[in-house]
Amino acid sequence: MKIYRFKGGFHPADHKDLSAGKNEMELPLLPKYTVILRQNVGSAPELCVKKGDIVKKGTLIAKEGAGLSVPLHSPVSGTVGDTVLVPGPNAGMVEAVEILTDMEHQEWDTSFPPISDWRDTPVKVLKQRVQECGVTGMGGAAFPTHVKLSPPPEKSVDTLILNGAECEPYLTSDDTLMRNHARAILVGGAVCAKILGITEICVGIEENKPEALQAMEQASWGIPGVNITVKVLPVKYPQGGEKQLLYALTGRKVIVGALPMDVGCVVIKVGSCYAVWDAVLNGHPLVERITTVTGTPVVDPGNYWLPIGAPLSAVLENAGGVKENSRTGKIIFGGPMMGFAQYSLDVPVSKNTSGILLLDESEVAQFTGGPCLSCGRCVEQCPMQLPVSSLSKACENERYDIALKKHVLACLECGVCSSVCPARRPNVQHFRKAKKELKELSWKEKNKQK
């Protein structure tokens, strides 16, 4: 089976040995959970409960809003508390609702009966279940999964790609899921394929996950109605990028401004497939996820099942806290390449919290923002083949008109350019700011036209 190699990228130290291969762990029940209302790209859902309402685990607490939106459900049985502002994982304060836990009695809401005969269930019903259970992407922008499974009629999709690459250093939550829940992931993938009306499923996993590869290959047999191929990928960052993975597995290129569906593919992470399986076959909304808690300062790094809304402080305490001789320099939600540094221990876990990473002071890179040396490393290793050096200068000088022409919106924010830069320029931060400014300008222009 041919594997295509994308241009650019590099090979950072992975540090996955800190958490890989350990048993899954759970967080003890907490007295309170704080559920952020807007957890995905698009609009926030609308709160549909009030203070004092009794809820069960999985009870709807915020209904789907307009546009790209998904509902939210209670992570535990208990009572609805206050609507509050809490630190958000991407900086700033965000709106959230408190759930005060019933410490004596926990049970699932039974609003969604299991669909055991999903093969004979209409596509409309399956898609509605995925939507009503709030399934999203389990990293990045947490894109609503039901939207991914609804390509326009004019888009001809023939292949579903399951993303098990997990190329981000330190993170092993997908690896753990594939080792221990391979069959559930692939059945969830088969449900997605049925919704899309296709039979071809291709799974991409990097070769540094041999146990996951073996488990997924063994589980791929005997699932009727689909043809599943598991492919071994070379270790290279960012192999798990949607466009890079698609090219590696199929040889199809997604041009700037296009989507995977434009070349006949839909890409879904293995964690989302597991959530689809849980929603359809068990009737469980997405209210918890497996997250890698890791880093050299952490006493007991590993992969933990965390309820949505659990505070960072409780997660770290359950992982044994910080080693006595360590000085934590940074706490990151996600991985070291694409994650976001946190400034508060009160920030809650969200649906896209793939990792919680602690770095020692000695491990934190310092970006000086010095002048570009014109060495060309960033251009050579950019997986999107962008003119990084000139693009960074344009963004730094707030020439967003030039940045737009140089395709800043195509930037993955993967961090390769900043990592290889000998001048330690904060390129990614420049690009993030530019993209935010351009988005706001576009929004203002649309409002003017109304």
Model-inferred region functions:
Residues 55-69, 84-87, 94-101:
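Short hydrophobic beta/alpha edge segments that flank linear recognition/processing sites
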Residues 353-369, 379, 383-450:
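Ferredoxin-type iron-sulfur electron-transfer modules in oxidoreductases and energy-metabolism complexes
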Residues 91, 98-162:
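Hydrophobic alpha-helical hairpins/lids featuring a short glycine-rich hinge
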Residues 78-80:
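Conserved hydrophobic positions within beta-strands
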